[in-house]
Amino acid sequence: MKFIIKLFPEITIKSQSVRLRFIKILTGNIRNVLKHYDETLAVVRHWDNIEVRAKDENQRLAIRDALTRIPGIHHILEVEDVPFTDMHDIFEKALVQYRDQLEGKTFCVRVKRRGKHDFSSIDVERYVGGGLNQHIESARVKLTNPEVTVHLEVEDDRLLLIKGRYEGIGGFPIGTQEDVLSLISGGFDSGVSSYMLMRRGCRVHYCFFNLGGAAHEIGVRQVAHYLWNRFGSSHRVRFVAINFEPVVGEILEKIDDGQMGVILKRMMVRAASKVAERYGVQALVTGEALGQVSSQTLTNLRLIDNVSDTLILRPLISYDKEHIINLARQIGTEDFARTMPEYCGVISKSPTVKAVKSKIEAEEEKFDFSILDKVVEEANNVDIREIALQTEQEVVEVETVNGFGPNDVILDIRSIDEQEDKPLKVEGIDVVSLPFYKLSTKFGDLDQNRTWLLWCERGVMSRLQALYLREQGFNNVKVYRP
């Protein structure tokens, strides 16, 4: 099988040296992502496209899906590459390929040509289109808005019969821009802002301020791992978790109520800037949107920025909440965000929307900054690829099984879409569906006299959720890995 990768248009307008660098990086990213599917896979770069050739037909859908999620790719063409002799040969091959698709439909033919030939692209379009129209009685030519467009590409003595076109996510290849550190909370905003910077070519590391205990961190790990695995797995990234509960405690004890929100954000920026400096990261990324909450007015954002020289990027600054939620739905983080607790907004009962710098600084003089230094020093830094392994170590008390007993029930915790695409059926045992994002509120409604075997495709989510349920006091859970 063969795929032709078309570049994001902004790449094609770069200077020759920059364009070549971007294509080289994108080629490497594709190899890094796809090597897990087919070790014999070949990735070949050209001036205006990249070829991907693989032998394992069983991996066709997986490879195609992975390609659509790699930043820098505008669209993918799934093609059949065959030799040809003349225009009539092109027509005959097109007839075999497209006859069934054109029955009873309107169509047109579009041709792209590279190389030296005694015919033009328009000549091929007319010849092939006329031939298809004559040989398929129920088909009809329609040059504007046809039901089917027959795409052909002619390159030297090769004909590419395009079997399907699949849109990518666009953007720049990861690694073409410098690294950033995303302040991730697991909510709608931080997930979308992280995705937007990945799409713009940055390797995104994650910094999480834990305000809610182990269960909160587990949830945010899920989001970060999901984003990395889905859009950024071509590169290794860090997940840095900082226990911010001592900082919040100090703020609650010593800081005036109205100033708490801004000061908490200033502490987060100070801490994240230290982490960024430690790892040579150039900028911070937040999901803040203008006016969304009290700390996100222009006055307050300016005061928050003043505590650090590190550049702070806010890709969602002009977005409304509905737009952000729609983007979260598109990239798959909506379900995570809907069940993620939000702690920042509850520590201040009457937050200021226009903080005064002198008052903020006066309040911060009451704060013991050794606490901030200590939590940053003790920050837990892991390679995001190790999250699954680390979860295995944390859930030592949760048994992983590959079989089942008479009192067991498999609990499929995948999202509804995944369950509909690939329903789970296991002979000899009941399978119950309960998406991961409903476990916190619905698991208690299940029959607690049964033993529930949590299952998901890769096993990462099931382990994380098993730990979460154990934290909540449910001891009748195991992880099912057949």
UniProtKB/Swiss-Prot annotation:
The record's CDD domains line, in alphabetical order, gives: PPase_ThiI, RHOD, THUMP_ThiI
Q: Which UniProt keywords apply?
A: ATP-binding, Cytoplasm, Disulfide bond, Nucleotide-binding, Redox-active center, RNA-binding, Thiamine biosynthesis, Transferase, tRNA-binding
A GO MF term: tRNA binding
Q: Cellular component terms, GO, for this chain's entry?
A: cytosol
- Listed HAMAP family: ThiI (MF_00021)
| Protein name from the UniProt record | tRNA sulfurtransferase
Pathway in which this enzyme or protein is active = Cofactor biosynthesis; thiamine diphosphate biosynthesis
Question: SUPFAM superfamilies under this entry?
Answer: Adenine nucleotide alpha hydrolases-like (SSF52402), Rhodanese/Cell cycle control phosphatase (SSF52821), THUMP domain-like (SSF143437)
Domain (Rhodanese) ranges: 404-482
Write down the SMART domains for this protein, in alphabetical order: THUMP
- Which reactions does this protein catalyse? [ThiI sulfur-carrier protein]-S-sulfanyl-L-cysteine + a uridine in tRNA + 2 reduced [2Fe-2S]-[ferredoxin] + ATP + H(+) = [ThiI sulfur-carrier protein]-L-cysteine + a 4-thiouridine in tRNA + 2 oxidized [2Fe-2S]-[ferredoxin] + AMP + diphosphate; [ThiS sulfur-carrier protein]-C-terminal Gly-Gly-AMP + S-sulfanyl-L-cysteinyl-[cysteine desulfurase] + AH2 = [ThiS sulfur-carrier protein]-C-terminal-Gly-aminoethanethioate + L-cysteinyl-[cysteine desulfurase] + A + AMP + 2 H(+)
Cysteines joined through disulfide linkages: 344-456
Residue sites binding ATP per the record: 183-184, 265, 287, 296
Might you name a Gene Ontology BP term for this protein? thiamine diphosphate biosynthetic process
